From Swiss-Prot:
SUPFAM superfamilies: OMPA-like (SSF56925). One of its GO terms (biological process) is transmembrane transport. Belongs to the OmpW/AlkL family. It comes from the Bacteria. InterPro entries: OMP/PagP_b-brl (IPR011250), OMPW (IPR005618). One of its GO terms (cellular component) is cell outer membrane. It is found in: Cell outer membrane. Keywords: Cell outer membrane, Membrane, Signal, Transmembrane, Transmembrane beta strand. Residues 1-23 form the signal peptide. This is Putative outer membrane protein RF_0060. It holds the Pfam family OmpW. Its main location: membrane.
Length: 244
């Protein structure tokens, strides 16, 4: 009988230790579990987002439609402009969590290439022309874009868009005039929300733009030479935004 009591006592003692250890481990697990109530939750409080961006402009600037050269020994014309830089300001209007429209106004700079202008002057009758100081091509696009926000909740929110732009074109390069243009725009980007009302934006937009070029008589002789240039600039930007 005494042996049985001793065995029962040992079993109860070991059981109590085991239960106490299990309860302590459960308490520690609960205590170390994440507090979901305190996890940051990003949600738009307003239907407007204002953004300011700076970025690089990448363009091949290939010409097409040039007339037959008058020079007996023509040379390749090549690209009329180099890559450049620019920036824009935009306002995004949300209709719901997924659909929005972005209105933007930009200012971009493309550097003209001396070699291209000199080649045009050589091919169409004016050699040894003084090109003067290198003057850039300015592109000022006003753009309307419809956007679809793929994941509108959380701190990382990607989006895609398609729209249309009208671009005011300007240059003071010697003997060169560029006409205004317009075309489609494709867009992809992502917003990183730092706080409920502040975000970092990375944006990529492909502009389709083929404006008309006019080479003036002081560069090409007695008559104006016209062509089209396939600018189609790709603009990669980073910026900051605020929700309202």
């Amino acid at each position: 009988m005494l042996r049985i009591v001793k065995k029962l006592g040992i079993i109860l003692f070991v059981s109590s230790i085991s239960i106490n250890s299990f309860a302590k481990s459960m308490y520690d697990d609960v205590d170390s579990a994440p507090d979901y109530d305190s996890t940051p939750y990003y949600e738009n409080e307003g239907s407007l987002v204002f953004k300011m961006r700076l970025g690089g402009v990448f363009s091949s600037a290939k010409q097409k439609g040039l007339p037959t050269p008058t020079s007996p020994q023509p040379v390749p014309v090549g690209e009329v402009a180099k890559n450049g830089y620019g920036g824009d300001a935009s306002t995004t209007i949300f209709f719901n969590n997924y659909l929005a429209t972005e209105l933007s106004l930009g200012f971009n700079v493309l550097r003209t290439k001396y070699t291209s202008l000199a080649a045009v002057a050589h091919n169409y009758g004016v050699n040894n022309v003084k090109l003067g100081k290198n003057k850039p091509i300015y592109m000022i696009p006003a753009t309307v874009t419809g956007q679809f926000h793929i994941a509108p909740y959380g701190g990382i929110r990607p989006y895609v868009g398609v729209g249309y732009h009208g671009s005011y074109m300007l240059t003071q390069a010697t003997g060169l005039k560029i006409r205004n243009g317009h075309g489609l725009v494709g867009q992809i980007g992502v917003d990183f929300y730092a706080k409920d009302d502040t975000l970092i934006n990375i944006d990529v937009r492909q502009f389709f733009l083929n404006p008309k070029l006019e080479y003036k008589p002081n560069l090409v002789g007695t008559k104006t030479v016209t062509s089209k240039v396939k600018l189609n600039p790709l603009i990669v930007s980073i910026g900051i935004g605020f929700t309202f």
